[in-house]
Amino acid sequence: MPVLPKKYQTRKAEITADFITAVNEHIDQVMGGRIDKMYHIQDFARLLFIHPVHLSNTIKLHTGHAPCYFFEMRLMEEARKMLLDQTLTITDIAAKLTFDNSNFTKFFKRFEGVTPSQYRLQHAASSEVALQVNGL
């Protein structure tokens, strides 16, 4: 099996790191209300000055995951955090993440195995148990 030159391996790591940084910055901007639409792979490729297919293939080769994996994991991280805030409705959370309510529920359940409402109830119950154990 041929061995890839070290320069090529380094470039794959650089592209992957730049992509993950761009995803994190983009989601921070969406969460901060500075942008109201989610980027697609073409948008990230344009930011990194490379072809979308090259970006996708490079990330997949370097990490074993498609680019959408990193994007979706970051969205799930934000969704979980927001669901712990009882003052936010699920509709508000969906809108903040640029989903409509039903698509957000499907998206969340695909990754978490429960609906956003069920997740919220489970974590509210575990918070109450923790408070009781600590005598608060």
Regions found by a protein language model. Name each.
Residues H62-F99, Q122-L136:
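Terminal helix-turn-helix DNA-binding modules in bacterial transcription factors
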Residues I41-F70, A94-T115:
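Basic/polar phosphate-binding segments, predominantly the helix-turn-helix DNA-binding elements
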Residues T10-L48, Y69-T87:
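A short, Lys/Arg-enriched amphipathic alpha-helix from helix-turn-helix/homeodomain DNA-binding modules
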Residues M1-K12, S56:
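Basic, amphipathic alpha-helix used for nucleic-acid engagement in HTH/winged-helix/SANT-Myb modules
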